[in-house]
């Protein structure tokens, strides 16, 4: 009886294990079909896209490292913010990594990739500069479709600037005497339709503008974040996203923690090698100063030469004799 019971247990355990294995295999096999049929990005696909070895992310890292670094920081910000407000943190993180892939088309026209070189916009009309900046959203959605990033990520790329105005070049056009149409300097939208898209919009604007802070203390960082977020809110960009005032407060706190950690000051460590060098020079100086007396006693014929060598050692030097002094 015991033997039969043991066999039955092993048989049932084997069946259950096989069933679990087959279920997992089927799930992985049909995941792409589900994504295509229902235009839904599964969690498995998001985790795959988060791998920094993905071709698009590698292109960002090599071709536009400034934008790549910006995207990494934004991805950390949105992940923390999404967790704070109960949004989809994985979707936010992945979308943030890809939100600026459209900048691959004209990388040198974005300030984070110029590395103190000439600003190409200086030779362009404001309208042309605005057109280039506006194009990165359209180009980004095209690349997202080509690489099958999924509808949710495409939507966030399309919405992460909403219908915002490119204020710098619009003001520049007005100052140059033109009569610009405001719609020519606005992103086509739509405004963020989900909390995840709104979180990416806020983090993107906050991170990019925080680079202008000259003395990024925690208080100034927090004030800066609140100013940027209030501006976006007052423009109505968040009206369709379902973010609440409570959510905005939590996002501000989360962003502040990330940026404060990014901009934290480091301790200036003392140069220990300098102290070691000074200590090692002292015996040499004492040795050189002792040499003339020793040689004066043993070799009277070089007394004047040694005296000249000793007088050539300047105060505070390492004790080296003049070029013509004795060894």
Predicted ranges, named:
Residues 2, 24-47:
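Juxtamembrane or sensor-core-proximal signal-transducing alpha helices
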Residues 34, 80-83, 98, 149, ...:
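Divalent metal-dependent phosphate-bond-processing catalytic cores, especially two-metal-ion Mg2+/Mn2+ enzymes
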Residues 12-13, 23, 40, 173-174:
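Generic detector of short, locally flexible boundary/turn motifs and exposed helical patches
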Residues 13, 17-29, 33, 144, ...:
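Hydrophobic transmembrane alpha-helical segments of multi-pass transport and channel proteins
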Residues 2-4, 43, 86-88, 102, ...:
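Proteins with a high burden of low-complexity, intrinsically disordered sequence enriched in S/T/G/P/A and R
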Residues 1-15:
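Transmembrane helix-loop junctions at the membrane interface of multipass transporters and ion channels
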Residues 40-58, 100:
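Juxtamembrane inter-helical linkers in multi-pass membrane proteins
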Residues 57-218, 222-225, 231-235, 245:
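Divalent metal-dependent catalytic cores for phosphoryl transfer on phosphate-bearing substrates
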């Amino acid at each position: 009886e015991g033997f039969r019971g043991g066999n039955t247990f092993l048989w049932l355990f084997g069946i259950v294990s096989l069933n679990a294995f087959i279920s997992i295999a089927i799930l992985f096999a049909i995941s792409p079909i589900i994504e295509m049929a229902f235009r839904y990005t599964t969690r498995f696909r998001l985790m795959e896209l988060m791998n920094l070895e993905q071709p698009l992310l590698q292109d960002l890292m090599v071709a536009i490292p400034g934008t790549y670094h910006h995207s990494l920081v934004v991805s950390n910000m949105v992940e923390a913010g999404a967790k704070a407000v109960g949004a989809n943190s994985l979707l936010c993180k992945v979308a943030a990594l890809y939100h600026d892939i459209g900048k691959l088309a004209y990388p040198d026209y974005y300030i984070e990739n110029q590395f103190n070189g000439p600003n190409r916009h200086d030779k362009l009309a404001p309208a042309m500069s605005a057109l280039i900046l506006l194009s990165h959203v359209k180009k980004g959605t095209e690349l997202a479709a080509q690489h099958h990033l999924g509808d949710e990520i495409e939507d966030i790329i399309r919405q992460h600037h909403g219908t915002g105005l490119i204020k710098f070049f619009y003001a520049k056009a007005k100052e140059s005497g033109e009569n610009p149409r405001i719609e020519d300097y606005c992103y086509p939208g739509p405004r963020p339709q989900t909390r995840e898209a709104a979180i990416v919009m806020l983090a993107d604007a906050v991170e990019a503008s925080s680079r202008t802070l000259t003395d990024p203390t925690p208080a100034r960082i927090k004030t800066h974040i609140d100013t940027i977020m209030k501006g976006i809110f007052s423009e109505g960009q968040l009206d369709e996203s379902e973010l609440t005032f409570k959510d905005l407060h939590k996002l501000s706190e989360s962003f502040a923690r990330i940026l404060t950690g990014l901009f934290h000051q480091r301790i200036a460590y003392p140069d220990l090698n300098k102290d070691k060098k000074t200590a090692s020079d002292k015996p040499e100086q004492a040795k050189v100063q002792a040499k003339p007396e020793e040689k004066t006693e043993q070799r009277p014929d070089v007394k004047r030469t040694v005296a000249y060598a000793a007088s050539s050692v300047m105060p505070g030097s390492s004790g080296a004799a003049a070029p013509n002094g004795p060894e």
